[in-house]
Amino acid sequence: MALRFPRFSQGLAQDPTTRRIWFGIATAHDFESHDDITEERLYQNIFASHFGQLAIIFLWTSGNLFHVAWQGNFEAWVQDPLHVRPIAHAIWDPHFGQPAVEAFTRGGALGPVNIAYSGVYQWWYTIGLRTNEDLYTGALFLLFLSAISLIAGWLHLQPKWKPSVSWFKNAESRLNHHLSGLFGVSSLAWTGHLVHVAIPGSRGEYVRWNNFLDVLPHPEGLGPLFTGQWNLYAQNPDSNSHLFGTSQGSGTAILTLLGGFHPQTQSLWLTDIAHHHLAIAFIFLVAGHMYRTNFGIGHSIKDLLEAHTPPGGRLGRGHKGLYDTINNSIHFQLGLALASLGVITSLVAQHMYSLPAYAFIAQDFTTQAALYTHHQYIAGFIMTGAFAHGAIFFIRDYNPEQNEDNVLARMLDHKEAIISHLSWASLFLGFHTLGLYVHNDVMLAFGTPEKQILIEPIFAQWIQSAHGKTSYGFDVLLSSTNSPAFNAGQSIWLPGWLNAINENSNSLFLTIGPGDFLVHHAIALGLHTTTLILVKGALDARGSKLMPDKKDFGYSFPCDGPGRGGTCDISAWDAFYLAVFWMLNTIGWVTFYWHWKHITLWQGNVSQFNESSTYLMGWLRDYLWVNSSQLINGYNPFGMNSLSVWAWMFLFGHLVWATGFMFLISWRGYWQELIETLAWAHERTPLANLIRWRDKPVALSIVQARLVGLAHFSVGYIFTYAAFLIASTSGKFG
């Protein structure tokens, strides 16, 4: 008999029903569960797949560069970044009628095009690219890297080139190489690019390979570096009248601590950015030489962890046993990596708008909104994934003997206290926040807005004041003209910071009031509830009072049969599944808040947010309804406009989202009956009955249906909001 899918599981391959296909897809990447898997093959497969991942990333970024060079208007945009709409790529669609062709022919293009809201134009411009030829060169280089990555992936699957398990478990060497090589050397290389190419480019000098060695980035060359006069590199920075991309008003400094923003581009000073990357490079190059490998010097991570027993005895045996636990569990390592990456991605979202690094991106409002929303959603999925793999670690890899009375074991020992405290925090936040919103809503409905409960966020305002915001009148730290920090700041460090924080044209430390106070606590409710569900799922993954033997059933199980009540819906997978809904809900509130506050800021009517955000109808009417009006009227009997595609996507997103409920609010027996009926009809219908299938059609399992429902819910939710966000922002600001 020919080998059937899935080849990695002979048991599943012999399943006579359609479960074979769905379950095969579901477990394709769960290498640990495959037939004949060994620890060595597991590590080697994952390692080789990393190269495939890199190849895809390089191919994708190469495609971005290639399509902009081929179909975009980069060179025209460079001449006038504030008024030319950047084109992502052309749209080829024979179904378009003439009104559509006209509506989508924008940005000086000859035919219908998509506008770029990803910020790539601003990024490429800032780092020194100026012509289509530059873009093509970059695309080819990335294509080359993609091919190299594919070859490397293939190579590391060949017997001679397969690394051993001991190589994968050499944590010190890996840390040294990743810290100094990946972060240190790459940051140093990036500093080099900024200093040699980007900064001269911002001053009107075009540096490429042909003149790279002739153009000195600084008039003094390397002299100050070797003579210790490093301060010379910071002298004579670009002036406030500097026109980006020209020599007008430019200076000669390459590494500065100016603070604040370039007045024309509203982005961080390039010389500050170069300085930052140099500092990062230095720190990581040092950090990459900390751990003991071949030479018998440096730290041994195992020794550090074994020695660390916190005083007072409250944490038991501290970190004993953790080194081997982490080093032998891929899920633990992945959980740590995802948790870190998730936080970093969310920080990227926050900092890309508040401290924009790319020239003119702050004035491209739709791009700002798109990038913030994009990074927050990505962060949400990555963070929930961290807890999922944490739970899998507890089920598959955790060894109680190895971790006796250490910090990990003690987390499990007092999980009731952790879970109940989180539950209390969630309940407190939820009832109080909703209570305030509902009270205010009723007061507005009864025509007595003055009876609202409006709480000033005085602690947050005090923190903003401590950083230099003067409008609240707190007179503390950097907002106090008498403080030594304030006086030092004028000359020594970041003199531009205080100007920037008190200028109302950027997003640094926005003025906050009662509306912000309320939505902040709504978001806190979402974060705490999401965390509660995820933490409970992980801490109860091995077992609970209700089901002490839970770990024997694996990560995702529907129930322990009909005869054991209370065992349904309590697998660690179910907790992850429920948490994703809360995660999406929370990020919905986060992005609504960010977007509405910024729309009013950009339009110059901040009072609309301040007045309407304190009650529920304000959010529904003055944010959601007002901003979706153009989408609801995307095309009508009079033709269409450039927002029509978003109007269609808005509808389509709702459709996908609603489809999710068909899988979520439904039971398996209903589908099985329906399938039996359809199969019966199929077999008795002429022509149709010529087509036979080998697998008996069966309904999706409970867990699979939930996954399909969750996927539709998530995708529809994000599509709907993406269309709303882009259309409502670009409709107002072009």
Swiss-Prot record:
The PsaA/B heterodimer binds the P700 chlorophyll special pair and subsequent electron acceptors. PSI consists of a core antenna complex that captures photons, and an electron transfer chain that converts photonic excitation into a charge separation. The eukaryotic PSI reaction center is composed of at least 11 subunits. Phylloquinone binds at residue 671. This is Photosystem I P700 chlorophyll a apoprotein A2. Its main location: plastid. GO terms for molecular function: 4 iron, 4 sulfur cluster binding; chlorophyll binding; electron transfer activity; magnesium ion binding; oxidoreductase activity. [4Fe-4S] cluster binds at residues 559, 568. Its EC number is 1.97.1.12. P700 is a chlorophyll a/chlorophyll a' dimer, A0 is one or more chlorophyll a, A1 is one or both phylloquinones and FX is a shared 4Fe-4S iron-sulfur center. It is a multi-pass membrane protein. It holds the Pfam family PsaA_PsaB. It is an enzyme of class 1 (oxidoreductase). The lineage of its organism: Eukaryota, Viridiplantae, Streptophyta, Embryophyta, Tracheophyta. Chlorophyll a B3 binds at residues 662, 670. Belongs to the PsaA/PsaB family. PANTHER family: OUTER MEMBRANE PROTEIN, OMPA-RELATED (PTHR30128), PHOTOSYSTEM I P700 CHLOROPHYLL A APOPROTEIN A1-RELATED (PTHR30128:SF19). It is found in: Plastid, Chloroplast thylakoid membrane. PROSITE patterns: PHOTOSYSTEM_I_PSAAB. PsaA and PsaB bind P700, the primary electron donor of photosystem I (PSI), as well as the electron acceptors A0, A1 and FX. PSI is a plastocyanin-ferredoxin oxidoreductase, converting photonic excitation into a charge separation, which transfers an electron from the donor P700 chlorophyll pair to the spectroscopically characterized acceptors A0, A1, FX, FA and FB in turn. Oxidized P700 is reduced on the lumenal side of the thylakoid membrane by plastocyanin. Signal peptide: none annotated. Keywords: 4Fe-4S, Chlorophyll, Chloroplast, Chromophore, Electron transport, Iron, Iron-sulfur, Magnesium, Membrane, Metal-binding, Oxidoreductase, Photosynthesis, Photosystem I, Plastid, Thylakoid, Transmembrane, Transmembrane helix, Transport.
